[in-house]
Protein backbone atom coordinates (compact mmCIF):
# COMPACT_ATOMS: atom_id res chain seq x y z
CA UNK A 1 0.00 0.00 0.00
CA UNK A 2 2.87 2.36 0.91
CA UNK A 3 4.64 1.55 -2.35
CA UNK A 4 1.54 2.39 -4.40
CA UNK A 5 1.06 5.64 -2.46
CA UNK A 6 4.65 6.76 -3.00
CA UNK A 7 4.42 5.88 -6.71
CA UNK A 8 1.28 8.00 -7.05
CA UNK A 9 2.97 10.97 -5.27
CA UNK A 10 5.96 10.64 -7.57
CA UNK A 11 3.65 10.63 -10.58
CA UNK A 12 1.95 13.81 -9.40
CA UNK A 13 5.35 15.52 -9.20
CA UNK A 14 6.14 14.52 -12.78
CA UNK A 15 5.57 17.55 -15.09
CA UNK A 16 4.86 15.36 -18.11
CA UNK A 17 2.01 13.69 -16.26
CA UNK A 18 0.57 17.09 -15.28
CA UNK A 19 0.63 18.30 -18.90
CA UNK A 20 -1.01 15.09 -20.13
CA UNK A 21 -3.68 15.33 -17.44
CA UNK A 22 -4.41 18.96 -18.32
CA UNK A 23 -4.77 18.12 -22.04
CA UNK A 24 -7.08 15.24 -21.20
CA UNK A 25 -9.31 17.38 -18.98
CA UNK A 26 -9.36 20.22 -21.54
CA UNK A 27 -10.40 17.82 -24.32
CA UNK A 28 -13.15 16.33 -22.14
CA UNK A 29 -14.59 19.73 -21.20
CA UNK A 30 -14.33 21.43 -24.58
CA UNK A 31 -15.32 18.57 -26.87
CA UNK A 32 -17.75 16.59 -24.78
CA UNK A 33 -19.25 18.88 -22.16
CA UNK A 34 -19.31 22.21 -23.98
CA UNK A 35 -19.43 21.13 -27.64
CA UNK A 36 -17.23 23.94 -28.96
CA UNK A 37 -16.98 25.08 -32.56
CA UNK A 38 -13.83 23.00 -33.02
CA UNK A 39 -16.11 20.05 -33.78
CA UNK A 40 -17.66 20.36 -37.21
CA UNK A 41 -20.73 18.21 -37.58
CA UNK A 42 -22.24 18.51 -41.04
CA UNK A 43 -25.19 16.22 -40.39
CA UNK A 44 -28.46 18.02 -39.96
CA UNK A 45 -27.50 21.35 -41.55
CA UNK A 46 -30.07 20.83 -44.30
CA UNK A 47 -32.84 20.71 -41.71
CA UNK A 48 -31.82 24.00 -40.11
CA UNK A 49 -30.51 26.22 -42.93
CA UNK A 50 -33.04 26.99 -45.66
CA UNK A 51 -33.05 29.08 -48.83
CA UNK A 52 -35.97 31.49 -49.26
CA UNK A 53 -36.35 32.07 -53.02
CA UNK A 54 -37.96 35.25 -54.34
CA UNK A 55 -40.99 33.30 -55.55
CA UNK A 56 -41.54 31.80 -52.11
CA UNK A 57 -41.39 35.18 -50.36
CA UNK A 58 -43.85 36.51 -52.93
CA UNK A 59 -46.15 33.63 -51.98
CA UNK A 60 -45.83 34.34 -48.25
CA UNK A 61 -46.36 38.04 -48.93
CA UNK A 62 -49.82 37.32 -50.34
CA UNK A 63 -50.94 35.60 -47.13
CA UNK A 64 -52.97 37.64 -44.60
CA UNK A 65 -51.37 39.10 -41.48
CA UNK A 66 -52.41 37.62 -38.14
CA UNK A 67 -51.51 40.34 -35.63
CA UNK A 68 -49.18 43.17 -36.58
CA UNK A 69 -49.18 44.81 -33.14
CA UNK A 70 -46.25 42.63 -32.07
CA UNK A 71 -44.19 43.33 -35.20
CA UNK A 72 -41.67 46.13 -35.67
CA UNK A 73 -39.31 47.59 -38.22
CA UNK A 74 -36.04 48.67 -36.62
CA UNK A 75 -32.91 50.62 -37.45
CA UNK A 76 -30.11 51.93 -35.28
CA UNK A 77 -28.04 55.12 -35.19
CA UNK A 78 -24.89 56.16 -33.35
CA UNK A 79 -24.58 59.65 -34.87
CA UNK A 80 -26.86 62.38 -36.25
CA UNK A 81 -26.30 61.50 -39.91
CA UNK A 82 -27.47 57.94 -39.40
CA UNK A 83 -30.34 59.00 -37.16
CA UNK A 84 -31.48 61.33 -39.94
CA UNK A 85 -31.12 58.54 -42.52
CA UNK A 86 -33.14 56.17 -40.37
CA UNK A 87 -35.94 58.72 -40.01
CA UNK A 88 -36.01 59.29 -43.80
CA UNK A 89 -36.33 55.54 -44.39
CA UNK A 90 -39.21 55.27 -41.96
CA UNK A 91 -40.96 58.28 -43.49
CA UNK A 92 -40.73 56.34 -46.75
CA UNK A 93 -42.36 53.32 -45.07
CA UNK A 94 -45.19 55.47 -43.70
CA UNK A 95 -45.80 56.93 -47.16
CA UNK A 96 -45.78 53.39 -48.58
CA UNK A 97 -48.68 52.53 -46.22
CA UNK A 98 -46.87 49.80 -44.34
CA UNK A 99 -49.21 47.67 -42.23
CA UNK A 100 -46.61 47.51 -39.44
CA UNK A 101 -47.46 50.11 -36.77
CA UNK A 102 -44.14 50.02 -34.91
CA UNK A 103 -41.20 51.87 -36.48
CA UNK A 104 -38.39 51.95 -33.92
CA UNK A 105 -34.95 53.53 -34.07
CA UNK A 106 -32.43 52.43 -31.45
CA UNK A 107 -30.06 55.36 -30.95
CA UNK A 108 -27.01 56.12 -28.85
CA UNK A 109 -28.41 57.72 -25.71
CA UNK A 110 -25.90 60.60 -25.76
CA UNK A 111 -27.29 62.06 -29.01
CA UNK A 112 -29.96 64.15 -27.31
CA UNK A 113 -27.26 65.93 -25.25
CA UNK A 114 -24.68 66.99 -27.87
CA UNK A 115 -26.50 69.17 -30.41
CA UNK A 116 -29.85 70.23 -29.05
CA UNK A 117 -30.95 72.01 -32.25
CA UNK A 118 -30.32 68.94 -34.42
CA UNK A 119 -31.92 66.67 -31.89
CA UNK A 120 -34.99 68.88 -31.59
CA UNK A 121 -35.53 68.98 -35.37
CA UNK A 122 -35.04 65.24 -35.79
CA UNK A 123 -37.26 64.45 -32.83
CA UNK A 124 -40.10 66.61 -34.17
CA UNK A 125 -40.02 64.93 -37.59
CA UNK A 126 -39.90 61.48 -36.00
CA UNK A 127 -42.85 62.36 -33.80
CA UNK A 128 -44.81 63.69 -36.80
CA UNK A 129 -44.52 60.30 -38.54
CA UNK A 130 -45.06 58.25 -35.37
CA UNK A 131 -41.51 56.94 -35.31
CA UNK A 132 -40.32 55.71 -31.92
CA UNK A 133 -36.85 56.85 -30.85
CA UNK A 134 -35.50 54.48 -28.21
CA UNK A 135 -32.31 55.35 -26.34
CA UNK A 136 -29.75 52.64 -25.61
CA UNK A 137 -26.14 52.58 -24.44
CA UNK A 138 -23.43 52.39 -27.07
CA UNK A 139 -21.92 48.91 -27.42
CA UNK A 140 -18.20 48.75 -28.24
CA UNK A 141 -15.66 46.02 -27.64
CA UNK A 142 -13.07 48.63 -26.75
CA UNK A 143 -13.52 52.34 -26.16
CA UNK A 144 -10.01 52.88 -27.54
CA UNK A 145 -11.24 51.62 -30.92
CA UNK A 146 -12.17 54.61 -33.11
CA UNK A 147 -12.66 52.73 -36.39
CA UNK A 148 -15.77 53.20 -38.52
CA UNK A 149 -17.23 49.91 -37.30
CA UNK A 150 -16.34 50.16 -33.61
CA UNK A 151 -19.89 51.07 -32.56
CA UNK A 152 -21.58 48.66 -34.98
CA UNK A 153 -22.27 46.24 -32.11
CA UNK A 154 -24.94 48.71 -30.97
CA UNK A 155 -27.29 47.19 -33.55
CA UNK A 156 -27.42 44.04 -31.40
CA UNK A 157 -29.82 45.88 -29.08
CA UNK A 158 -32.54 44.81 -31.52
CA UNK A 159 -32.26 41.25 -30.19
CA UNK A 160 -33.20 42.53 -26.74
CA UNK A 161 -36.50 44.14 -27.80
CA UNK A 162 -38.58 41.22 -26.53
CA UNK A 163 -41.84 43.18 -26.46
CA UNK A 164 -42.03 42.27 -30.17
CA UNK A 165 -42.50 38.82 -31.69
CA UNK A 166 -40.68 39.56 -34.94
CA UNK A 167 -38.45 42.39 -36.12
CA UNK A 168 -37.34 43.36 -39.61
CA UNK A 169 -34.10 45.31 -39.31
CA UNK A 170 -32.10 47.14 -41.94
CA UNK A 171 -29.10 49.45 -41.73
CA UNK A 172 -29.96 53.12 -41.99
CA UNK A 173 -27.50 53.66 -44.85
CA UNK A 174 -29.96 51.72 -47.00
CA UNK A 175 -32.75 52.97 -49.25
CA UNK A 176 -36.14 51.45 -50.06
CA UNK A 177 -37.04 51.52 -53.74
CA UNK A 178 -39.77 50.43 -56.13
CA UNK A 179 -38.53 50.69 -59.70
CA UNK A 180 -41.05 51.47 -62.47
CA UNK A 181 -41.34 48.99 -65.33
CA UNK A 182 -40.56 51.71 -67.85
CA UNK A 183 -36.97 52.80 -67.31
CA UNK A 184 -36.15 56.43 -68.05
CA UNK A 185 -33.16 57.48 -65.98
CA UNK A 186 -33.54 61.17 -66.83
CA UNK A 187 -37.14 61.44 -65.61
CA UNK A 188 -37.65 58.53 -63.23
CA UNK A 189 -38.38 58.48 -59.51
CA UNK A 190 -38.85 55.49 -57.26
CA UNK A 191 -42.33 54.79 -55.97
CA UNK A 192 -42.88 54.32 -52.24
CA UNK A 193 -42.39 50.74 -51.15
CA UNK A 194 -42.42 48.56 -48.02
CA UNK A 195 -41.11 45.07 -47.29
CA UNK A 196 -43.94 43.87 -45.03
CA UNK A 197 -43.79 40.44 -46.69
CA UNK A 198 -40.66 39.61 -44.68
CA UNK A 199 -42.75 39.45 -41.50
CA UNK A 200 -44.67 36.55 -43.04
CA UNK A 201 -41.83 34.09 -43.63
CA UNK A 202 -42.26 30.86 -41.60
CA UNK A 203 -42.30 31.38 -37.84
CA UNK A 204 -39.99 28.36 -37.50
CA UNK A 205 -37.20 30.58 -38.84
CA UNK A 206 -35.92 32.64 -35.92
CA UNK A 207 -33.34 34.39 -38.09
CA UNK A 208 -33.06 35.25 -41.79
CA UNK A 209 -30.71 37.42 -43.82
CA UNK A 210 -29.12 37.42 -47.27
CA UNK A 211 -25.92 35.56 -48.00
CA UNK A 212 -22.80 37.73 -48.24
CA UNK A 213 -22.30 36.46 -51.78
CA UNK A 214 -19.34 38.82 -52.39
CA UNK A 215 -17.23 37.12 -49.68
CA UNK A 216 -17.28 33.49 -50.83
CA UNK A 217 -14.04 31.57 -50.25
CA UNK A 218 -14.89 28.86 -52.79
CA UNK A 219 -15.45 31.40 -55.58
CA UNK A 220 -12.30 33.28 -54.53
CA UNK A 221 -10.25 30.06 -54.71
CA UNK A 222 -9.43 30.11 -50.99
CA UNK A 223 -11.35 26.87 -50.33
CA UNK A 224 -11.62 23.71 -52.46
CA UNK A 225 -14.34 23.58 -55.08
CA UNK A 226 -17.04 20.89 -54.86
CA UNK A 227 -16.03 17.64 -56.51
CA UNK A 228 -19.47 16.97 -57.90
CA UNK A 229 -20.74 18.86 -60.92
CA UNK A 230 -24.09 20.55 -60.52
CA UNK A 231 -25.94 21.93 -63.49
CA UNK A 232 -27.39 25.34 -62.72
CA UNK A 233 -30.93 25.27 -64.15
CA UNK A 234 -31.89 27.76 -66.83
CA UNK A 235 -34.68 30.27 -66.20
CA UNK A 236 -37.42 28.05 -67.59
CA UNK A 237 -36.47 24.97 -65.56
CA UNK A 238 -35.95 26.99 -62.41
CA UNK A 239 -39.32 28.71 -62.85
CA UNK A 240 -41.06 25.33 -63.12
CA UNK A 241 -39.33 24.15 -59.94
CA UNK A 242 -40.45 27.26 -58.09
CA UNK A 243 -44.06 26.85 -59.25
CA UNK A 244 -44.07 23.30 -57.89
CA UNK A 245 -42.45 24.42 -54.63
CA UNK A 246 -45.00 27.20 -54.09
CA UNK A 247 -47.82 24.77 -54.85
CA UNK A 248 -46.44 22.24 -52.34
CA UNK A 249 -46.04 24.93 -49.69
CA UNK A 250 -49.64 26.04 -50.21
CA UNK A 251 -50.81 22.47 -49.59
CA UNK A 252 -48.54 21.23 -46.79
CA UNK A 253 -47.47 24.49 -45.06
CA UNK A 254 -44.17 22.84 -44.10
CA UNK A 255 -41.04 25.00 -44.03
CA UNK A 256 -38.94 21.83 -44.43
CA UNK A 257 -39.96 21.88 -48.10
CA UNK A 258 -37.76 24.95 -48.62
CA UNK A 259 -34.52 24.34 -50.56
CA UNK A 260 -31.28 23.63 -48.72
CA UNK A 261 -27.68 24.25 -49.70
CA UNK A 262 -26.48 21.67 -52.22
CA UNK A 263 -22.89 21.66 -50.94
CA UNK A 264 -22.67 21.87 -47.14
CA UNK A 265 -19.09 23.13 -47.13
CA UNK A 266 -20.44 26.11 -49.03
CA UNK A 267 -21.52 27.19 -45.54
CA UNK A 268 -18.73 25.69 -43.43
CA UNK A 269 -15.95 27.13 -45.62
CA UNK A 270 -17.49 30.59 -45.18
CA UNK A 271 -18.90 30.33 -41.67
CA UNK A 272 -17.24 33.53 -40.40
CA UNK A 273 -18.83 35.71 -43.07
CA UNK A 274 -21.63 33.68 -44.65
CA UNK A 275 -24.51 35.94 -43.59
CA UNK A 276 -24.78 39.64 -44.34
CA UNK A 277 -26.42 41.61 -41.56
CA UNK A 278 -27.38 44.91 -43.18
CA UNK A 279 -30.89 43.46 -43.33
CA UNK A 280 -32.25 40.79 -40.96
CA UNK A 281 -35.48 39.17 -39.88
CA UNK A 282 -35.17 38.17 -36.23
CA UNK A 283 -37.08 36.76 -33.30
CA UNK A 284 -35.96 38.83 -30.28
CA UNK A 285 -34.63 36.93 -27.29
CA UNK A 286 -32.86 38.05 -24.12
CA UNK A 287 -30.81 34.86 -24.21
CA UNK A 288 -29.64 35.65 -27.74
CA UNK A 289 -28.74 39.21 -26.75
CA UNK A 290 -26.79 38.06 -23.70
CA UNK A 291 -25.00 35.42 -25.75
CA UNK A 292 -23.99 37.99 -28.37
CA UNK A 293 -22.60 40.18 -25.58
CA UNK A 294 -20.40 37.24 -24.57
CA UNK A 295 -19.14 36.98 -28.14
CA UNK A 296 -18.15 40.65 -27.96
CA UNK A 297 -16.80 40.69 -24.40
CA UNK A 298 -15.37 37.19 -24.12
CA UNK A 299 -15.52 35.57 -20.67
CA UNK A 300 -12.04 34.65 -19.47
CA UNK A 301 -12.77 30.93 -19.55
CA UNK A 302 -13.43 31.01 -23.31
CA UNK A 303 -9.65 31.05 -23.77
CA UNK A 304 -9.77 27.47 -22.53
CA UNK A 305 -13.22 26.22 -23.45
CA UNK A 306 -14.29 28.10 -26.57
CA UNK A 307 -11.22 29.31 -28.42
CA UNK A 308 -12.90 29.13 -31.83
CA UNK A 309 -15.39 31.80 -30.77
CA UNK A 310 -12.92 34.32 -29.34
CA UNK A 311 -13.28 37.78 -30.82
CA UNK A 312 -10.37 38.88 -32.99
CA UNK A 313 -9.28 42.55 -33.12
CA UNK A 314 -10.92 43.06 -36.52
CA UNK A 315 -14.16 41.25 -35.68
CA UNK A 316 -17.14 43.57 -35.76
CA UNK A 317 -20.91 43.11 -35.95
CA UNK A 318 -20.97 40.89 -39.05
CA UNK A 319 -18.17 38.59 -37.89
CA UNK A 320 -19.56 38.27 -34.36
CA UNK A 321 -23.07 37.48 -35.56
CA UNK A 322 -21.72 34.82 -37.91
CA UNK A 323 -19.73 33.18 -35.11
CA UNK A 324 -22.86 33.02 -33.01
CA UNK A 325 -25.00 31.61 -35.83
CA UNK A 326 -22.32 29.07 -36.70
CA UNK A 327 -22.32 27.68 -33.17
CA UNK A 328 -26.11 27.62 -33.00
CA UNK A 329 -26.44 25.86 -36.37
CA UNK A 330 -23.85 23.25 -35.49
CA UNK A 331 -25.66 22.52 -32.25
CA UNK A 332 -28.97 22.38 -34.15
CA UNK A 333 -30.53 24.98 -31.87
CA UNK A 334 -31.77 27.42 -34.53
CA UNK A 335 -33.52 27.50 -37.89
CA UNK A 336 -32.12 30.07 -40.29
CA UNK A 337 -33.35 31.36 -43.66
CA UNK A 338 -31.32 32.81 -46.52
CA UNK A 339 -33.11 35.84 -47.97
CA UNK A 340 -32.83 36.58 -51.72
CA UNK A 341 -29.91 38.97 -52.00
CA UNK A 342 -31.02 40.25 -55.42
CA UNK A 343 -34.10 41.81 -53.80
CA UNK A 344 -33.14 42.68 -50.22
CA UNK A 345 -29.35 42.41 -50.02
CA UNK A 346 -28.21 44.51 -52.99
CA UNK A 347 -25.10 46.64 -52.58
CA UNK A 348 -24.75 49.74 -54.76
CA UNK A 349 -21.19 48.61 -55.36
CA UNK A 350 -22.46 45.58 -57.28
CA UNK A 351 -23.12 47.81 -60.29
CA UNK A 352 -19.53 48.99 -60.22
CA UNK A 353 -18.10 45.47 -60.29
CA UNK A 354 -16.55 43.96 -63.40
CA UNK A 355 -17.92 40.43 -62.87
CA UNK A 356 -21.44 39.59 -61.73
CA UNK A 357 -22.29 35.88 -61.92
CA UNK A 358 -21.93 35.47 -58.16
CA UNK A 359 -24.73 38.04 -57.82
CA UNK A 360 -26.86 36.46 -60.56
CA UNK A 361 -27.10 32.90 -59.21
CA UNK A 362 -29.39 31.62 -56.47
CA UNK A 363 -27.56 31.16 -53.12
CA UNK A 364 -27.38 27.35 -53.33
CA UNK A 365 -25.56 27.48 -56.69
CA UNK A 366 -22.84 29.95 -55.71
CA UNK A 367 -20.02 27.37 -55.24
CA UNK A 368 -20.52 26.12 -58.80
CA UNK A 369 -19.89 29.35 -60.72
CA UNK A 370 -16.74 31.02 -62.03
CA UNK A 371 -15.49 34.22 -60.45
CA UNK A 372 -14.71 36.01 -63.70
CA UNK A 373 -18.04 35.53 -65.41
CA UNK A 374 -21.01 37.67 -66.35
CA UNK A 375 -23.24 34.78 -67.33
CA UNK A 376 -26.88 35.79 -66.88
CA UNK A 377 -26.06 39.42 -66.05
CA UNK A 378 -28.76 41.83 -67.19
CA UNK A 379 -28.49 45.02 -65.11
CA UNK A 380 -31.92 46.43 -65.97
CA UNK A 381 -33.63 43.11 -65.20
CA UNK A 382 -32.06 42.92 -61.74
CA UNK A 383 -32.52 46.64 -61.14
CA UNK A 384 -36.30 46.18 -61.38
CA UNK A 385 -36.24 43.44 -58.70
CA UNK A 386 -34.62 45.55 -56.00
CA UNK A 387 -36.60 46.56 -52.92
CA UNK A 388 -33.76 47.53 -50.58
CA UNK A 389 -30.36 48.82 -51.66
CA UNK A 390 -27.43 49.36 -49.31
CA UNK A 391 -25.00 52.20 -50.05
CA UNK A 392 -21.71 50.32 -50.02
CA UNK A 393 -18.98 51.51 -52.40
CA UNK A 394 -15.92 51.84 -50.17
CA UNK A 395 -13.64 53.75 -50.51
CA UNK A 396 -16.04 56.00 -52.46
CA UNK A 397 -17.85 58.26 -49.94
CA UNK A 398 -21.52 57.69 -49.16
CA UNK A 399 -23.89 60.06 -51.00
CA UNK A 400 -24.36 62.30 -47.92
CA UNK A 401 -20.59 62.62 -47.44
CA UNK A 402 -18.33 65.13 -49.14
CA UNK A 403 -16.77 64.07 -52.45
CA UNK A 404 -13.70 65.31 -54.28
CA UNK A 405 -13.18 64.43 -57.95
CA UNK A 406 -9.42 64.68 -57.53
CA UNK A 407 -9.15 61.96 -54.88
CA UNK A 408 -7.68 58.52 -55.61
CA UNK A 409 -10.95 56.69 -54.83
CA UNK A 410 -12.40 57.95 -58.13
CA UNK A 411 -10.64 55.09 -59.92
CA UNK A 412 -13.23 52.81 -58.27
CA UNK A 413 -16.08 54.57 -60.07
CA UNK A 414 -17.35 53.58 -63.51
CA UNK A 415 -18.07 55.73 -66.56
CA UNK A 416 -19.88 54.83 -69.78
CA UNK A 417 -17.40 54.53 -72.65
CA UNK A 418 -20.05 55.99 -74.95
CA UNK A 419 -20.51 59.02 -72.73
CA UNK A 420 -19.23 62.57 -72.95
CA UNK A 421 -15.43 62.17 -72.98
CA UNK A 422 -14.79 65.90 -72.70
CA UNK A 423 -16.84 65.95 -69.48
CA UNK A 424 -15.05 62.79 -68.33
CA UNK A 425 -11.60 64.40 -68.53
CA UNK A 426 -12.83 67.69 -67.09
CA UNK A 427 -14.61 66.11 -64.11
CA UNK A 428 -11.78 63.69 -63.32
CA UNK A 429 -8.50 65.46 -64.12
CA UNK A 430 -6.24 63.13 -62.13
CA UNK A 431 -7.78 59.84 -61.00
CA UNK A 432 -10.23 58.61 -63.59
CA UNK A 433 -13.10 56.10 -63.29
CA UNK A 434 -12.97 52.81 -65.16
CA UNK A 435 -14.49 53.04 -68.63
CA UNK A 436 -17.05 50.33 -69.31
CA UNK A 437 -19.43 49.30 -72.06
CA UNK A 438 -21.97 48.32 -69.36
CA UNK A 439 -23.60 51.74 -69.58
CA UNK A 440 -26.83 50.56 -67.92
CA UNK A 441 -24.89 49.76 -64.74
CA UNK A 442 -23.36 53.24 -64.82
CA UNK A 443 -26.83 54.79 -65.11
CA UNK A 444 -28.17 52.62 -62.29
CA UNK A 445 -25.30 53.52 -59.94
CA UNK A 446 -25.77 57.23 -60.60
CA UNK A 447 -29.56 56.95 -60.30
CA UNK A 448 -29.34 55.52 -56.77
CA UNK A 449 -27.47 58.63 -55.64
CA UNK A 450 -29.80 61.02 -57.42
CA UNK A 451 -32.80 59.23 -55.90
CA UNK A 452 -31.26 59.54 -52.45
CA UNK A 453 -30.96 63.33 -52.86
CA UNK A 454 -34.66 63.46 -53.76
CA UNK A 455 -35.61 61.23 -50.80
CA UNK A 456 -33.84 63.44 -48.27
CA UNK A 457 -35.17 66.72 -49.70
CA UNK A 458 -36.97 68.58 -46.93
CA UNK A 459 -35.93 66.08 -44.25
CA UNK A 460 -32.15 66.52 -43.98
CA UNK A 461 -31.08 68.20 -40.75
CA UNK A 462 -27.86 66.40 -39.86
Curated annotation (Swiss-Prot):
Main location: Golgi
MF GO annotations: glycosyltransferase activity
Lumenal side: 36-462
GO cellular component, one term: Golgi membrane
Keywords: Golgi apparatus, Membrane, Signal-anchor, Transferase, Transmembrane, Transmembrane helix, Vacuole
E.C. designation(s): 2.4.1.-
Cytoplasmic side: 1-18
Compartment(s) where it occurs, according to its Swiss-Prot or TrEMBL record: Golgi apparatus membrane; Vacuole membrane
Record membrane topology: Single-pass type II membrane protein
Record bears the keyword Cytoplasm: no
Transmembrane segments: 19-35
Renumbered ranges of motif DXD: 171-173
InterPro entries with a match to the protein in the record: GNT1/Glycosyltrans_8, Nucleotide-diphossugar_trans
Record carries keyword Transferase: yes
Enzyme class name: transferase
Described purpose of this protein according to its UniProt entry: N-acetylglucosaminyltransferase involved in the Golgi-specific modification of N-linked glycans.
Family of the protein in this entry: Belongs to the GNT1 family.
PANTHER family: GLYCOGENIN SUBFAMILY MEMBER
Protein name: Glucose N-acetyltransferase 1
Organism for this UniProt entry: Candida albicans (strain SC5314 / ATCC MYA-2876)
